[in-house]
């Protein structure tokens, strides 16, 4: 009887499943149905539109723009010839309980490149001696909107000093790169220091290649491998550590 009852229940489940699948099939026209092709096109276009909307939200949000800029820098650096290693998003300990977040460290035969990505638009004004730089926009009324942001050269100088303490070697060539997005205009950015580079992303590959050619090889393959192993753990941080870092930065650079 138990076996017979199980078989009856099993047949009932199959019938219910059959009705469910039949109901689902009825919601879409069959391949031979006159409206099948039109329905398929609507579904495909709907998926594409939703995907595009999600991409644009991610691309043009503050966080999304920052990540996009860093990803593009990473991709460009892979085109540089020679032995190399790339470390994105390094959280280097300062020794006081705080961390310095380096957008990207590029280990290459010609030295160590430390990148700060600023995927900004508008006009950019600043010099290496100013605490704050200015980003300007033209608004719809014909006026100008201005925003201040902390001197990225000073920001990257902090990153480099922390990196030098970790490496315990100040004799390695270290280059400070501030890379702005292609949608901005560097109107009045004055530099005097060597090893300082403030450029747009479209200039990055040419700049690094010229720099590598000028300085030649200063790091061996073994040097690069050792540096990579030393710094890799600083890219593996928890979400809680990232949140603590972001909170400290917001408090420190609040104007």
Positions of predicted regions on the chain:
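Acidic active-site catalytic centers that drive phospho-/nucleotidyl reactions
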Residues: 13, 103, 116
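P/S/T/G-enriched low-complexity
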Residues: 1-37
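Polar interaction faces of repeat-based domains
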Residues: 128, 133
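Surface-exposed interaction regions that form or flank ligand-binding interfaces
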Residues: 37-100, 107-112, 118-126, 137-255
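Short hydrophobic/charged patches on amphipathic alpha-helices used for structural packing
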Residues: 21, 102-103
């Amino acid at each position: 009887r138990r076996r017979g009852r199980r078989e009856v229940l099993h047949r009932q489940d199959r019938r219910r499943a059959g009705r469910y699948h039949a109901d689902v099939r009825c919601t879409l026209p069959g391949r031979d149905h006159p409206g099948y092709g039109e329905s398929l096109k609507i579904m495909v276009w709907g998926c594409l539109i939703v995907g595009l909307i999600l991409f644009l939200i991610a691309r043009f949000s503050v966080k999304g723009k920052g990540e996009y800029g860093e990803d593009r820098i990473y991709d460009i650096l892979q085109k540089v010839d020679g032995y190399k290693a790339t470390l994105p998003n390094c959280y280097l300990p300062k020794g006081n309980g705080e961390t310095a977040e380096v957008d990207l460290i590029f280990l290459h035969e010609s030295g160590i490149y430390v990148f700060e990505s600023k995927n900004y638009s508008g006009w950019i004004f600043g010099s290496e001696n100013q605490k704050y730089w200015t980003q300007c926009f033209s608004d719809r009324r014909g006026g100008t909107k201005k925003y201040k942001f902390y001197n990225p050269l000073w920001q990257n100088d902090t990153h480099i000093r922390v990196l030098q303490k970790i490496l315990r070697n100040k004799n390695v060539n270290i280059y400070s790169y501030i890379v702005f997005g292609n949608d901005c205009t560097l109107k009045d950015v004055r530099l005097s220091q060597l090893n300082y580079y403030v450029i747009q992303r479209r200039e990055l590959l040419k700049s690094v290649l010229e720099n590598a050619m000028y300085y030649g090889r200063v790091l061996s393959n073994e040097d690069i491998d050792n540096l990579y192993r030393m710094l890799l753990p600083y890219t593996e941080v928890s979400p809680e550590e990232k949140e603590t870092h972001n909170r400290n930065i917001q408090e420190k650079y609040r104007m």
